[in-house]
């Protein structure tokens, strides 16, 4: 019995043991199947990655060219200093000392306890600390940074990487929590801890050569990176301004040689050297796809040092200018190398003409004198001769909508140049040609007429009497500009002996004519037409359909007729105004203005009567050709008259305008506190189209504004004349001027 019992017990144990072996084997087989069938490809990739060394190859940014092919911005060879995370975080000496101690101990290192290892490291640390201090001094000296600033930059690099590591660890902990795994895990190193990080840019080649040797002698400390910096050749240029056609008070046969700094800066823009959150979200370097795999965009952004267009054309065309990185993958087991070459960014040809831009900027510059308060202006008495007035001008090609020039004043740094600035310079960073908006005043009058004819509420030959004030019961509201005490309350009808047709109404800028058409159209239809002309599309404001309908609903006729002369609840940018006049010249086709050569496209067509357009152009021409035109001439007394616009070889069709402006806050001492608020300083406008006298075809649209300049004809008119002459000088209209007294030179 005893034997059988022992035998049975042994057999049971063997069976149990065998069962356990079978179960264990089954578990292993299932696990193996899971790893090979379900996770095999992922694990294989991971294993292969451990056998691969991968490096990214830098790309370079495309150039920005002007419409003639001149380079406005380009990448040129440069060198950057990059440091390791240990050096940035003050751990480089400790790591190097530990590596040396480990190397010197050899196989004995594994047998040493913690205290003996620490002793070995501490013995070597002073020398590595000395080398670290020497590195810091050398880096500060060669980078041109104060040592304190260098340490501040290094600290910022280390802190950024630490934050990234903490964020990665937090995500890993959350994932482990969801899976029910242990949370007692240390943070893993991240890629940025193994990479180099730029601390100084654009160092000389000799310095780069020196620091490369230093980096080789101090492994894991610094590297010199082949980089590129953005060169903008037109940052500084000289323009020779002919002054023989300026108004008599400042006219001279002696040209003015003017140095212009940054005349294209606000248009071309700039780049920054750091990727922001918005960049990382819009186009990340790595993105987890729907399948869970990591997808790499070699043109995407990575946290830290990146070249990114931050404003102007650099930002507008960022995705075209930005190239694709290359990649080199080296298989460590076989020494095979796979290489994907970088793809450079595309060149972008802008619509801007650099030389024309400089000429237009020079016309606005206070040193030329046209944007200084002058004796011939009709500006507020609170302004004095020599005060510098903010202004803007824009030129676009009618056929394409391409913007040829867009100038603004003041610009940053202009405060001490060419005239007293009576207002705050806080707005110097605004490009007034397309970022500021103003009531358009009388510039909308051609648009109102064309809209009225298109809607059938006015005939092409509509004639309307000017009785001085639109509402019979109110002689103090909705008046014509001529119905004033200083003009003895006369009217245009009295002046000509009858009603005005559109040509006379345009040339004389009769308010009553356009009050009438606006009243017939109603606010809703009028505002709809303004939007068709592009007003309110590019930064301006035009009452919405709901707001305009509400005006009609409450019977607010004064608000409606005010819109008919560009006053009230509307404001436009100079660019919008130029685009609207271009649409008039095209006969009803609206093309959105573009900064890209070849980028203009017809967006909408509102075909106007060719007769109506011809009448508008005749009226605009009479603004300067007829003695009664608001842009015709300036009287100097004694029967001496001076034409406002003279530009041999050109033909122009323009409209002047005076628009009510918000109070002007004078700050003459520049302390940021206004000493006086002026309410009678209107804005001066002038807009129109220009072509060659030879064929008489409108080819370019122009809009000019001088803030608080008073009358449009006497203040904005001479600026318009200078812009037209710039087009002549650059060969756009008339005969191209031969090289001679007027020139543009890049410095």
Each PLM stretch: what is its role?
Residues 307, 710-714:
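Ordered, soluble secondary-structure elements with a strong preference for glycine-centered loop motifs
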Residues 324-347, 352, 356, 378-442, ...:
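Beta-lactam-recognizing serine transpeptidase/beta-lactamase-like catalytic domain environment
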């Amino acid at each position: 019995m005893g034997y059988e019992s022992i035998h049975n017990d042994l057999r049971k144990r063997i069976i149990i043991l065998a069962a356990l072996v079978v179960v264990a084997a089954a578990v292993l087989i299932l696990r193996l199947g899971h790893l090979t069938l379900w996770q095999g490809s992922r694990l294989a990739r991971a294993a292969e990655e451990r056998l691969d060394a991968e490096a990214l190859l830098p790309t370079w940014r495309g150039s920005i060219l002007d419409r003639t092919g001149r380079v406005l911005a380009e990448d040129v060879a440069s060198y950057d200093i990059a440091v390791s995370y240990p050096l940035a975080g003050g751990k480089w000496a400790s790591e190097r000392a530990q590596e040396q101690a480990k190397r010197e101990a050899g196989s004995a290192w594994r047998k040493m306890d913690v205290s003996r290892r620490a002793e070995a490291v501490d013995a070597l640390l002073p020398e590595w600390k000395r080398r670290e201090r020497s590195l810091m001094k050398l880096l500060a000296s060669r980078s041109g940074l104060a040592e304190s600033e260098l340490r501040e930059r290094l600290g910022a690099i280390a802190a950024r990487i630490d934050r990234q590591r903490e964020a990665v660890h937090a995500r890993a902990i959350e994932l482990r929590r969801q899976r029910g795994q242990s949370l007692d895990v240390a943070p893993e190193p991240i890629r940025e801890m193994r990479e180099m990080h730029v601390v100084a840019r654009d160092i000389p080649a000799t310095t780069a050569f020196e620091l490369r040797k230093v980096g080789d002698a101090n492994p894991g400390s610094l590297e010199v990176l082949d980089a590129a910096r953005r060169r903008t050749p037109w940052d500084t240029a000289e323009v020779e301004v002919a002054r023989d056609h300026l108004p008599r008070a400042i006219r001279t046969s002696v040209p003015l040689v003017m140095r212009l700094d940054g005349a294209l800066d606000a248009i071309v823009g700039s780049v920054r050297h750091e990727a922001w959150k918005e960049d990382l979200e819009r186009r990340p370097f790595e993105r987890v796809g729907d399948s869970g795999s990591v997808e790499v965009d070699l043109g995407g952004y990575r946290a830290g040092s990146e070249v990114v267009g931050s404003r102007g054309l650099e930002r507008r065309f960022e995705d075209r200018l930005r190239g694709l990185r290359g990649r080199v993958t080296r298989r460590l087991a076989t020494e095979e190398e796979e290489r994907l070459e970088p793809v450079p960014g595309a060149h972008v040809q802008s619509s801007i003409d650099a030389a024309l831009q400089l000429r237009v900027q020079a016309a606005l510059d206070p040193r030329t004198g046209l944007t200084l308060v002058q004796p011939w202006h009709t500006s507020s008495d609170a302004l004095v001769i020599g005060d510098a007035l903010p202004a803007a001008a824009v030129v676009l090609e009618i056929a394409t909508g391409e913007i040829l020039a867009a100038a603004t004043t003041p610009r940053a740094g202009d405060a001490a140049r060419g005239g007293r600035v009576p207002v705050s310079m806080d707005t110097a960073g605004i490009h007034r040609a397309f970022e500021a908006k103003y009531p358009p005043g009388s510039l909308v009058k051609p648009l109102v007429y064309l809209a009225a004819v298109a809607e059938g509420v006015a005939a092409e030959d509509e004639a309307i009497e000017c009785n001085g004030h639109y509402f019979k019961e109110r002689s103090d509201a909705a008046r014509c500009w001529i119905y004033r005490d200083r003009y003895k309350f006369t009217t245009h009808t009295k002046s000509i002996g009858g009603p005005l047709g559109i040509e006379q109404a345009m040339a004389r800028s009769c308010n009553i004519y356009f009050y009438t058409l606006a009243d017939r159209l109603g606010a809703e239809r009028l505002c709809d037409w303004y939007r068709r002309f592009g007003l309110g599309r590019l930064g301006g404001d035009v009452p919405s359909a709901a707001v305009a309908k509400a005006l009609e609903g409450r019977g607010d006729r004064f608000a409606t007729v005010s819109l008919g002369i560009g006053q009230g609840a509307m404001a436009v940018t100079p660019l919008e105004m130029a685009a609207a006049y271009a649409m008039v010249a095209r006969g009803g086709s609206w093309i959105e203005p573009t900064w890209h050569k070849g980028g203009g496209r017809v967006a909408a067509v509102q075909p106007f009567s060719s007769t109506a357009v011809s009448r508008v152009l005749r009226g605009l021409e009479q603004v300067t050709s007829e003695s009664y035109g608001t842009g015709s001439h300036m009287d100097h007394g004694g029967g001496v008259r001076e034409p406002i616009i003279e530009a041999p070889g050109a033909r122009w069709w323009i409209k002047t305008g005076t628009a009510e402006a918000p109070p002007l806050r004078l700050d003459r001492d520049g302390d940021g506190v206004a000493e006086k608020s002026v309410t009678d300083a209107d804005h001066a406008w002038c807009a129109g189209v220009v072509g060659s006298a030879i064929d008489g075809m409108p080819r370019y649209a122009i809009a000019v504004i001088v803030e608080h300049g008073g009358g449009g004809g006497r203040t904005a008119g001479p600026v318009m004349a200078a812009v037209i002459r710039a087009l002549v000088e650059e060969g756009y209209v008339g005969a191209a001027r031969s090289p001679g007294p007027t020139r543009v030179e890049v410095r």
